[in-house]
């Protein structure tokens, strides 16, 4: 973390490389979010209602409590960790403190609302279908922003270069004398 905090990660090519490759995977995660959503629904509240409540016209059964619980059980830790990772790295980017706090709160709030919206549609009121559509769009925009902002932050000033001869060498510690 000290490399991120003081900006010296720019000189740590392997650290930048691993972070950039992780962001490649998270970009794939972000793209597949769209594919999964649009395979089941579209951006209309009616499609959300049909998916969660079922539709006689389309021969769709309503989502069961058990199936929703299984999806939520895997989504909560995964999405929580993704948002934690992205917002944690954003802490070291050159944004104002107030903006960082807003981005962090928005990221976690949108993730929670997006996950909760399906439950609200299914077990509270079909009127929450608008919440599902809105939070899906907003959360995907937030994920896209975080990934893009971090790529720009990591690419700033230099590009990750890996020297295979020195890749296994540890950086020399600085001589920090107490005053």
Label for each model-derived stretch:
Residues 1-15, 167-179:
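N-terminal juxtamembrane cytosolic/stromal segments of multi-pass membrane proteins
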Residues 13-43:
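N-terminal signal-anchor transmembrane alpha helix
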Residues 18-25, 103-111, 135, 139-142:
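Hydrophobic alpha-helical transmembrane segments of polytopic
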Residues 28, 108-119:
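Aromatic-anchored segments of alpha-helical transmembrane domains
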Residues 46-62:
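Perimembrane loop-to-helix junctions flanking transmembrane segments
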Residues 62-81, 90:
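Individual transmembrane alpha-helix segments
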Residues 84-107, 170-171, 177:
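Cytoplasmic juxtamembrane regions at transmembrane-helix boundaries
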Residues 116-174:
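Alpha-helical transmembrane segments of multi-pass integral membrane proteins
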């Amino acid at each position: 973390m000290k490399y991120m905090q003081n900006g010296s990660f720019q000189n740590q090519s392997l650290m930048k490389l691993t972070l950039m490759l992780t962001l490649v995977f998270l970009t794939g995660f972000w793209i597949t979010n769209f594919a999964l959503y649009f395979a089941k629904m579209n951006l209309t509240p009616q499609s959300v209602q049909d998916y969660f409540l079922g539709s006689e016209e389309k021969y769709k059964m309503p989502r069961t409590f058990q199936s929703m619980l299984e999806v939520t059980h895997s989504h909560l830790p995964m999405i929580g960790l993704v948002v934690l990772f992205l917002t944690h790295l954003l802490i070291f980017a050159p944004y104002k403190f107030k903006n960082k706090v807003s981005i962090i709160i928005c990221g976690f709030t949108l993730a929670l609302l997006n996950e909760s919206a399906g439950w609200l549609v299914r077990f509270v009121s079909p009127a929450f279908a608008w919440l599902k559509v809105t939070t899906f769009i907003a959360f995907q925009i937030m994920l896209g922003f975080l990934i893009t902002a971090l790529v720009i932050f990591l690419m700033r000033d230099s590009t990750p270069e890996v020297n295979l001869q020195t890749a296994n060498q540890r950086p020399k510690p600085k001589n920090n004398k107490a005053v």
